[in-house]
Amino acid sequence: MRLLERVIHAYPRAFDLVLADGLYLTAPFFNFLLAPRKHLLVVLKDERRNLYKDAAGMFDFIAPQQGTRGSRDCLWWDFPDLLSWPQVNRAVRVVRSLETWSVRRQLDKRESIQTSDWIWATTLSAAQTSTAWAVGFGHQRWDIENHAFNELVSQWQADHVFKPEPNAMECFLLVAFLAYNIFHAFWALSLKPQAKRGTTQSFWATLICAELHGRAIPGFLSP
């Protein structure tokens, strides 16, 4: 929480929602972020909690809504305004996504049906975020790990130790994170769809590198 406290103090409008694992499903953490009007969406997997028990008790009696997420067929349950967690300073919403999809096995080329069951607790109201968006936010926590950190290692050499000294290693990582965020903000917010068409992120990264080298080294781009 110390890191979040520093971030909120320095950049109070940088974010509105925190995504977290079930480890952070605690009343002090919820209340800490509710105070500066931030929202949370946290994995709910502790079957001993009253919040989980109350939601689970309604799964068999309330029909789910059908939805999709990519190639997956989903059944969604959405229970807003639950008061099963009085230690939290507001009502909590529980969202469940039961997902089914098929995978073709490489060995025998047969299709195998896969399922996954996700439950989240969130402070976002139904008016603020639809069920589909809440499910999408819940899965984005894994996207950060599977895509962002994966890309940082494979494309940005973030796992390479340029100088084996703690402060230097921290600085290199922070600069890598900053460069990664700036580049992806440029890709997502500045480039128009027409400019992206037929190109890749690597193409634009190469152009940016060429521009930076051209400015740093006089005559770099000269014929």
Where are these regions (language model features)?
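A short acidic (Asp/Glu
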Residues: 27-31, 52-54
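Conserved, well-structured functional cores that handle cations and Mg-NTP chemistry
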Residues: 1-29, 36
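Short amphipathic alpha-helical "interface-anchor" segments enriched in bulky aromatics
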Residues: 128-163
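An anionic, glycine-rich sequence signature occurring as long contiguous blocks
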Residues: 39, 45-141
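Non-catalytic, well-ordered alpha-helical scaffold segments
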Residues: 118, 132, 146, 169-176
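Short, conserved catalytic/metal-binding motifs centered on acidic residues
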Residues: 17-23, 40, 120, 144-149, ...
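A short, flexible helix-boundary coil/loop motif
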Residues: 74, 80-83, 153-223
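Generic secondary-structure signature for well-ordered alpha-helical cores
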Residues: 9, 60, 64, 183-187, ...
